[in-house]
Structure formats: structure tokens, C-alpha cells
């Protein structure tokens, strides 16, 4: 089940509401990444406390471990991981294509060796849909080939990007056919590919619109390309996505990327950056980023961000977080993760409010001024 209501627009920025089988999501929204059915360093209780509305699971990794047979015994991923709100699962395509020499791509699908034990495995649009049916994720992603930015150390050519994109379109049709054959009651999103070429992106989008997916994602960005190329493609594709469907920008990115994405009409984002950076002591705040390992914070009594209401900022100093990071305490990674995800989710809340009140451009100007000010 999917119902998307567009509540308000402000320029290309959109305020919406997405109804799924496990709940209602207010958009624009950020989705914390739970690769193995767990958002690293966070319990479902803590995710609820920071108002996470939807999380992302990884089809490829969950298929390898614990395996579909285990998750099937629980009736799906929600019951298995103790999370009762919506879940989006990616198709596994990006992970398979990241295996490099360990995989062989054919029209049928991808043959590869398991990175865990070397077993010979095969993933195709049909297999991906079957796995995601067992996971019972609220949003299922089509199986696609993520066009790399570079091939053999040089940017992909138009011909290479076109060949990859057109195979993804054929796989989109097979994904849709299998999704319907499985009688999956959830939502299926198509993925726009085409590399750095606007005309190929347009061709991909036109092909997906014929298939009438429940939502549309932009894939193949933040894969090593220069930031100006990413923004050029985003600003071209975002406003062209169908207005009556949710728009998802995959694997992006920094706070600045999220604001730019919303300005281009994006409704949904995911990225490992807030959780991964948290574990490495890189913290995002309203007034710029903090690298908590730096000696300047060893006796700093201030909270990370005086404007932040997260558990870490309400209770602990920068000096204490510096100490936890320096000593490798698990609590440090946990508090840092709580803060970074709270910051990302609060940023999305502020953008929703700004769009609703017709002041999004003013918000963008203030956001950049604050981030440039420094902490």
C-alpha cells in the first residue's frame, strides 16, 4: 500500500505525507541506514526517541546473513529486528556491483562469489523481488545496475552509461513483473540511471514512467563524481520527476546535500554518513562540523551544539565526548551516533516547517550562514 499526498510546495521544495503499510511518513525525510537489520550503535527504542520515521535495510547483506529462511520464520524483517515502523530495502544491486572482480554481469543477472565464504551465488531482478517479499519491507527497490562514475580509471563514456542504463530499464520491467507475480502488498520504486548524462537520465525516467512505479529514485550519484557533476544531474532530474509520486535520492549525503536535494524536489534520503562519521568522531552541528578527537575540545565544557535537544547535547560536554573517543569507549560511539542522527532528522523537520510556512529560501540562506559560522 502506498498513498502519497503533496501538501505544499515552495519553489521545487515539497512537503508531503507518505502512507505505507507500517505507518505514515512526513516528507522530506532522512532514513537511517540499518545494513544488517540494525542501525549501528542504536536500539529501536533510541531510534523512536529521535523520531526516526523509516529506516533502510540492505537486501544483499540480509540475504547472506542471517538468510531469507531465518527471516521468513519471523514473518519479515520488522518482527525479526523489533521495529514496527516502515522499512525501505535496497535491491542488492549496488553491493553486488561493488564486488568488482568477484562478479560477472549478464542480461539475466549477476553471478558472484559470496564475500563471506566464497559460495557461488546469483542475483537477478526476480531473485531480488523474492528476497524483498520475504523481508516484507514497506518500500521495495527495483534491481538495477548502478552505473559507475569511473571505468578502468576514467569517466564512463556515453555509450557505457547508455548500455548500463538500458539494461537497468529492462531489469525494471522484470522487477515490476515479479513484484506483481509475488502479489507483494507493499510499494515498488524504480531507479533513474544514466550516469552524468542528462539525455540518458531523461531516457531512463521516460522508461520508468511507462512502467508506473509507486515512486521514483535517483541512483548513481555520490559514486565518486565531482560535486559539481552531482549537483548538475540532481538539479536536472529532480524537478522532472513525476509530481504525484515520492522522489528518493539514494546514498546522499552531507547536510548541504540534503538541503540541495530538497531544493531540487527530493522527498527521501539515506546515507551512512551520520552513523559512520559518528563512530569516527566527526560530528555535525548547526554551526559546522566538529572533529571531537582534536585537542582543543579536551577541556571544553560546552555541549556539542547548544541549539540541539538530543540526549548527548542535553547531558554531556565536548570534553567528555573527547575523552570517550580518545579512550575508545563504546559509549562515545553511541552518543555521537544519537547526536548525528538527531541532527539530520531535526534538519529535515526544520525544512518541512519552512516549506509549510513558505519560507524555504530564507531557511536555506540561514542554514548556509550558520554552517559557515563555525562551532
UniProtKB/Swiss-Prot annotation:
Name the reaction it catalyses.
Answer: 7-aminomethyl-7-carbaguanine + guanosine(34) in tRNA = 7-aminomethyl-7-carbaguanosine(34) in tRNA + guanine
Residues covered by region (RNA binding) = 251-257, 275-279
Enumerate the cofactors the protein uses. Zn(2+)
Q: What is its EC number?
A: 2.4.2.29
Its keywords, alphabetically, are: Glycosyltransferase, Metal-binding, Queuosine biosynthesis, Transferase, tRNA processing, Zinc
- Quote a single Gene Ontology cellular component term: cytosol
**Binding residue positions for substrate:** 90-94, 144, 193, 220
Record Gene3D superfamilies = Queuine tRNA-ribosyltransferase-like
- What Gene Ontology molecular-function terms does this entry list? metal ion binding; tRNA-guanosine(34) queuine transglycosylase activity
Q: Which residues bind Zn(2+)?
A: 308, 310, 313, 339
- Signal peptide feature range: none
* SUPFAM superfamilies xref list: tRNA-guanine transglycosylase
Which GO biological process annotations does it have? queuosine biosynthetic process; tRNA wobble guanine modification; tRNA-guanine transglycosylation
Self-association and partners: Homodimer. Within each dimer, one monomer is responsible for RNA recognition and catalysis, while the other monomer binds to the replacement base PreQ1.
Matches recorded under PANTHER family? QUEUINE TRNA-RIBOSYLTRANSFERASE
Official protein name in the record: Queuine tRNA-ribosyltransferase
The gene from which this protein is expressed is: tgt
